[in-house]
């Protein structure tokens, strides 16, 4: 169509020129006419490469990144396919279906609190990105925060590349946790039993995150399972939203699960809980009991015919310009040098001059607690060191495909309702785990939004039965 338009415009232009010159001046000899000279140089345009990017929710930042990429790359057009319709869990199910049936998309965009790529990795549906890193001039293995990279490559390959992350961590008081490096079962149980107010974390969430970070298992010799259930018994069935921050400061709430994505969040929660606040992890867990939630993650479909072009888009987030314009760096960056700068910037204290000439610190935020207002100021060296240690010691990431979670949550209800003893409950959980030879590949049904403190975390997964049904359809 573009070629015909070009010829038509040239023809109109040539005829107009002839009319201006006069018909008597037309050369009827054997020389090549002007029109023939012009049309001889026309070359058909190369068709554009269309890349489909599958997303759930269509974040404005992603749309901006795609628009920026399309504007800078001739011949490549990325089109966003938003799988979200009536709810996120159905959207995730459709996305899994399209990937596993070979329909696409070329690029998958997600967060690890939305979906889990483990099933896709095991089925060979997504690319190992290590070879792409090895030949990239933009980002390499050495550029990524080491603890995060070790978690991302725990299975021997890199099947998703996030741009940012946040940390799940518990926060409590020194009187409940004497050593932040090890929140013991005895301390946690004493805290939930002796506190005047209910914790804000629910039973299901405590059991879920405890399983994810390796706080307990279904192994026969692992008695941590019973201890987690005993602690969960003291927790509310539903997550509590507490508006009275004084209860935290006064130690009347045992602990809470916090999502720390930058130094300001860290400093704010530490201030609310008071000078004796302690950031710690889940009892008995790996990596000091904390969890990575990777954000703005990208995976490449192994059946895509445009893998290099897809990688070029993913890579654009990690250029110097991309880090300044499209990467959501309000959360911790996955790039070590950018993270270092984020932490360093948080210690910069600004000042202002009062009307009487005094130089005063400018707070980074002010909040109300009780009937007073309190200020939070720039980070101190010990704050930055604490956050560095939290990041460096984290060894697991948010997952939703562990069968242990759903089984434990379901069976523990019998104990909570007084229908089974703790021994009977633990035995039932272990038996069900043992009955699942492919338990690692199975996923529990989860479609919940759990409110945690003053933020919400969405936790979704495709059900085991759905994946099994899909696997059956593939082989028909």
Task: Locate the predicted segments by residue.
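Mature extracytoplasmic/periplasmic domains
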Residues: 45, 296-399, 423
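C-terminal motif of bacterial Sec signal peptides marking the signal peptidase cleavage site
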Residues: 21-22
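Extracytoplasmic/periplasmic substrate-binding proteins
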Residues: 235-312, 333
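Helix-loop-helix "hinge/cap" segment bordering the ligand-binding cleft or interdomain interface
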Residues: 130-136, 149-244, 302-308, 421
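Hinge/lid segment of periplasmic solute-binding proteins
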Residues: 111-169, 276-283
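Early extracytoplasmic/lumenal segment of secretory-pathway proteins
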Residues: 46-115, 246
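Conserved small/polar residues in nucleotide/adenosyl-binding loops
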Residues: 462-472
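Short helices/loops that flank or line small-molecule/ion binding pockets
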Residues: 89-104, 108, 118, 242-264, ...
């Amino acid at each position: 169509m573009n070629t015909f338009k070009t010829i038509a415009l040239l023809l109109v232009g040539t005829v107009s020129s002839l009319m201006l010159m006069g018909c008597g001046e037309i050369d009827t000899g054997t020389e090549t006419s002007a029109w023939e000279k012009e049309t001889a140089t026309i070359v058909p345009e190369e068709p554009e490469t269309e890349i489909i990017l599958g997303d759930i929710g269509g974040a404005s930042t992603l749309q901006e990144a795609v628009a920026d990429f399309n504007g800078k790359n001739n011949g490549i057009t990325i089109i966003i396919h938003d799988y979200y319709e009536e709810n996120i869990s159905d959207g995730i199910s459709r996305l899994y279906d399209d990937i596993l049936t070979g329909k696409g998309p070329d690029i998958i965009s997600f967060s690890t609190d939305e979906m889990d790529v483990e099933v896709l990795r095991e089925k060979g549906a997504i690319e190992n990105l290590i070879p792409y890193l090895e030949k990239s001039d933009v980002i390499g293995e050495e550029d990524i925060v080491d603890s995060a990279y070790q978690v991302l490559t725990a299975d021997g390959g890199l099947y998703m590349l996030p741009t940012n992350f946040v940390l799940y961590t518990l926060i409590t008081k020194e009187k409940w946790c004497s050593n932040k490096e090890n929140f013991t079962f005895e301390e946690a149980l004493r805290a939930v039993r002796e506190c005047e107010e209910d914790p804000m974390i629910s039973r299901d969430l405590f059991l879920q995150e405890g399983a994810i970070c390796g706080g307990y298992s279904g192994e026969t010799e692992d008695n941590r399972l019973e201890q987690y259930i005993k602690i969960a018994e003291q927790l509310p069935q539903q997550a509590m939203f507490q508006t009275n921050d004084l209860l935290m400061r006064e130690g009347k709430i045992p602990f809470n699960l916090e999502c720390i994505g930058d130094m300001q969040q860290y400093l704010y929660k530490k201030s609310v809980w008071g000078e004796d606040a302690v950031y710690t992890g889940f009892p008995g867990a790996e990596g000091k009991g904390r969890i990575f939630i990777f954000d703005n993650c990208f995976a490449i479909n192994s059946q895509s015919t445009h893998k290099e072009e897809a990688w070029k888009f993913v890579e654009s987030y990690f250029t110097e310009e991309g880090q300044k314009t499209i990467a959501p760096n309000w959360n911790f960056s996955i790039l070590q040098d950018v993270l270092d700068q984020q932490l360093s910037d948080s210690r910069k204290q600004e000042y202002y001059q009062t009307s009487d000439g005094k130089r005063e610190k400018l707070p980074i935020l002010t909040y109300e607690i009780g009937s007073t207002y309190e200020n939070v100021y720039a980070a101190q060296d010990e704050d930055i060191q604490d956050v560095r240690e939290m990041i460096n010691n984290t060894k697991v990431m948010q997952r939703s495909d562990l069968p242990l979670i759903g089984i434990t949550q379901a069976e523990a209800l019998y104990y909570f309702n007084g229908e089974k003893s703790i021994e009977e409950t633990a035995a039932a959980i272990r038996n069900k785990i043992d009955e699942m030879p492919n338990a690692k590949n199975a996923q529990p049904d989860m479609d919940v939004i759990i409110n945690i403190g003053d933020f919400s975390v969405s936790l979704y997964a495709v059900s085991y039965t759905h994946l099994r049904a899909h696997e059956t359809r593939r082989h028909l």
